Swiss-Prot record:
Organism encoding this protein: Arabidopsis thaliana
GO biological process, one term: translation
Matching Pfam families: Ribosomal_L18A (PF01775)
Keywords assigned by UniProt, alphabetized: Ribonucleoprotein, Ribosomal protein
Name by which UniProt lists this protein: Large ribosomal subunit protein eL20x
Keyword Ribosomal protein attributed: yes
The UniProt record lists the keyword DNA-binding: no
Family from the record: Belongs to the eukaryotic ribosomal protein eL20 family.
Molecular functions per Gene Ontology: mRNA binding; structural constituent of ribosome
GO cellular component: cytosol; cytosolic large ribosomal subunit; cytosolic ribosome; plasmodesma
Length: 178
């Protein structure tokens, strides 16, 4: 739905059944990736780190892409993340305004790459949530909550009323600023 670079997937997996544990615990994660292969890879990365289950002795049960319920209404999204920089690991909370969560996550990845030089593999999204307007913390998202917001027109190009009056060269330079 939309031309997003990152898609949200729900990945379900577990360790392979053994004689000791015939019904291993099933784990479900919501992850972002460019495609299903990247989402599976990220799932096994976290399983290896958190639960000591590797892909070689694990089993993938299901993978589904998650789509937005209302992709035309604008919402505030809060993203809790952990990232690895040159000096260590850091926790962070970010807020974005977008129509879909995928759009907000893409904004987050772009901002982290530009401001902190942190690329996709070094970022771990801990949690995401739709934040109501009264609970927003960041000024950059709060500024759009004003119902009487105005965007001033600071640059106007005066166009000729007809094609006949259009000229290549002007006698005087036009003043474009108001």
């Amino acid at each position: 739905m939309g031309g997003f670079r990152f898609h949200q997937y729900q990945v379900v997996g577990r360790a392979l059944p053994t004689e000791n544990d015939e019904h291993p615990k099933i784990y479900r994660m919501k992850l972002w990736g460019r495609n299903e292969v990247c989402a599976k890879s990220k799932f096994w990365y976290f399983m290896r780190k958190l639960k000591k289950v590797k892909k070689s002795n694990g089993q993938m049960l299901a993978i589904n892409e998650i789509f937005e319920k209302n992709p035309t209404t604008i919402k505030n999204y809060g993203i809790w993340l952990r990232y690895q920089s040159r000096t260590g690991y850091h926790n962070m909370y970010k807020e974005y305004r977008d129509t879909t969560l995928n759009g907000g996550v893409e904004q987050m990845y772009t901002e982290m790459a530009s401001r902190h030089r942190v690329r996709f593999p070094c970022i771990q999204i801990i949690k995401t949530a739709t934040v109501p307007a009264k609970l927003c913390k960041r000024e950059i998202t709060k500024q759009f909550h004003n119902s009487k917001i105005k965007f001033p027109l600071v640059f106007r190009k005066v166009r000729p009323p007809s094609r006949k009056l259009k000229t290549t060269y002007k006698a005087s330079k036009p003043n474009l600023f108001m």
